[in-house]
């Protein structure tokens, strides 16, 4: 018996490296490494099979400028079967609360170490941004939140769960963002590209101010970026912003970065990438006489598209975005086919299904002919994904001046023309109307996560969704049927928010944290 190995050694594990949890939360270098983990956690919203959340957030679900075919988060897109037990809504909640939990650990650890250390202070500020940003994203979707700013320990596992007031939530968001703004730098070295800067934090702070109708604050934050954010400027052409695999250009404030290098593709397998490109790319390769081709976007699922209402907002003769940001026509590309090189007629499928999936015009913003150039049938992409860019900052500042000073505001007109004139349109001299600004938001920023919160913030989400969401056969004669269930099922006062995930209600107790009233 004495010769048998003891369990004692197994009960006293020894780390084979210096990187332990204690190291990560108790040293400046450890906190700096821990913050990098927040970037990875944030990017997971777009990774691989879990990327539905990013598609829903960015591709204008339940708005007036998108038509949905099938597949990705169908219950959210159509609203006819959306319930509190929806898995995507659960994932959205847990994703952001996971970020909040990790940020809480970093923030408290940094404060315990002392913020006099520059490395510690920077880690603290970045964690503050991520926490404030996560709460803001959650509030826009759910409104009813549990507010927590402390790390979870064995001493506080039992908690008093109760919904925080809107005032409490916004005070927390604003406080976190203000702390980040006060600490973060305008410029970062090239090796740190992709990390949060003062400009990113100010952009989000301006968004928060717009919700509060604090237009003076929104204007200040935006114009600080225009004046002091010297590493940012508008690209000469709109299409230049999205051209290439690495979207490292002067207009991008923040992007999720992807790489085909080992470890550059996110969680899961080392080369997971994301699927936004194939979800928004027409399934052209399924047409007889066609094959996978990088120049047409590679692999396409054909699930989410711009609709006819959006296309109708462009001056097709003058506005360069109409041609440069979309693919409107497809061509037979199999050299063995007799029709090789000819345009595929849009009415190929007549009254039968096929057009929406295989021939519908598509957005090129997430189109990827770069990372899949040698493997166009690959079902993932490694093209960077933009989160915020300067064009939104300018239009947000335009809107703020409009609300404060009216449609003849010289500043509102100046900022409106930053995107409008760049696209080849004759300069607009005003006066502006709210509809003009909303239309320019759509033309410039479709499929960039702007439309849904914009319409909700202005109290227009229900009206716009009921009037224009999806497409009817009468609006697009090539369709086989209507694709506009959101119009029929959007209930005013209910679908402007998501239900609290049922699992979370069960965990916290309905008596402590009840379901939102419209979803009871």
Describe each region flagged by the PLM.
Residues 215, 407-409:
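TPR-repeat structural position
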Residues 8-69, 178-181, 198-346:
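An aromatic- and glycine-enriched ligand-binding surface/loop that stacks and positions planar moieties
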Residues 7-10, 67, 96-99, 172-174, ...:
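Long, intrinsically disordered, low-complexity segments
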Residues 1-3:
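Conserved small/polar residues in nucleotide/adenosyl-binding loops
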Residues 309-389:
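Flexible, polar/acidic helix-loop-strand segments at domain edges
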Residues 32-46, 68-142, 164-168, 177-189, ...:
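Conserved, well-structured interaction surfaces
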């Amino acid at each position: 018996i004495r010769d048998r190995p003891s369990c004692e050694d197994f009960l006293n594990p020894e780390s084979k490296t210096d990187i332990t949890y204690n190291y990560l939360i108790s040293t400046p270098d450890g906190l700096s490494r821990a913050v990098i983990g927040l970037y990875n956690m944030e990017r997971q919203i777009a990774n691989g099979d879990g990327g539905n959340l990013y598609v829903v957030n960015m591709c204008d679900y339940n708005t007036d400028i998108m038509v949905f075919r099938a597949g990705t988060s169908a219950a959210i897109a159509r609203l006819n079967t959306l319930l509190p037990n929806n898995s995507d809504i659960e994932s959205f909640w847990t994703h952001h609360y996971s970020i909040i939990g990790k940020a809480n650990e970093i923030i408290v650890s940094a404060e315990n170490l002392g913020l006099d250390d520059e490395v510690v202070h920077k880690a603290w500020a970045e964690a503050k941004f991520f926490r404030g940003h996560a709460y803001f994203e959650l509030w826009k979707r759910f409104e009813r939140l549990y507010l927590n700013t402390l790390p979870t320990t064995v001493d506080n596992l039992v908690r008093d769960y109760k919904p925080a007031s809107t005032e409490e939530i916004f005070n927390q968001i604003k406080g976190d963002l203000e702390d980040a703004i006060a600490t973060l730098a305008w410029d970062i070295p090239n090796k740190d590209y992709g990390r949060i800067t003062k400009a990113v934090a100010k952009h989000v702070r301006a968004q928060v101010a717009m919700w509060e109708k604090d237009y003076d604050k929104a204007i200040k934050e935006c114009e600080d970026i225009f004046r002091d954010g010297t590493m940012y400027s508008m690209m000469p052409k709109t299409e230049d912003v999205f051209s290439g695999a690495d979207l490292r250009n002067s207009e991008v404030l923040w992007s999720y970065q992807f790489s085909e290098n080992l470890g550059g593709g996110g969680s899961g397998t080392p080369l997971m990438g994301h699927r936004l490109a194939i979800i928004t790319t027409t399934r052209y390769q399924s047409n007889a006489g066609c094959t996978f081709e990088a120049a047409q976007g590679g692999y396409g699922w054909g699930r989410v598209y711009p609709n006819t209402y959006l296309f109708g907002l462009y001056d097709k003769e003058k506005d360069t975005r109409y041609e440069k940001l979309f693919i409107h026509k497809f061509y037979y590309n199999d050299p063995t086919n007799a029709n090789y090189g000819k345009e595929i007629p849009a009415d190929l499928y007549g009254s039968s299904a096929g057009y929406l999936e295989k021939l519908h015009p598509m957005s090129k913003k997430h189109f990827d002919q770069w990372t899949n150039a040698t493997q166009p049938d690959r079902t993932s992409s490694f093209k960077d994904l933009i989160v915020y860019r300067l064009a939104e900052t300018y239009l947000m500042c335009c809107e703020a001046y409009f609300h404060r000073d009216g449609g003849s505001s010289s500043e509102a007109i100046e900022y409106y023309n930053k995107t409008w004139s760049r696209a080849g349109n004759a300069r607009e001299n005003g006066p502006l109307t709210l509809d003009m600004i909303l239309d320019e938001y759509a033309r410039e920023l479709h499929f960039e996560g702007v439309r849904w919160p914009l319409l909700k913030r202005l109290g227009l989400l229900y009206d716009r969704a009921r009037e224009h969401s999806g497409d009817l056969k009468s609006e697009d004669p090539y369709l086989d049927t209507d694709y506009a269930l959101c119009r029929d099922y959007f209930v005013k006062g209910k679908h402007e928010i998501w239900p609290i995930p049922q699992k979370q209600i069960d965990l916290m107790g309905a008596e402590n944290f009840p379901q939102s009233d419209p979803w009871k």
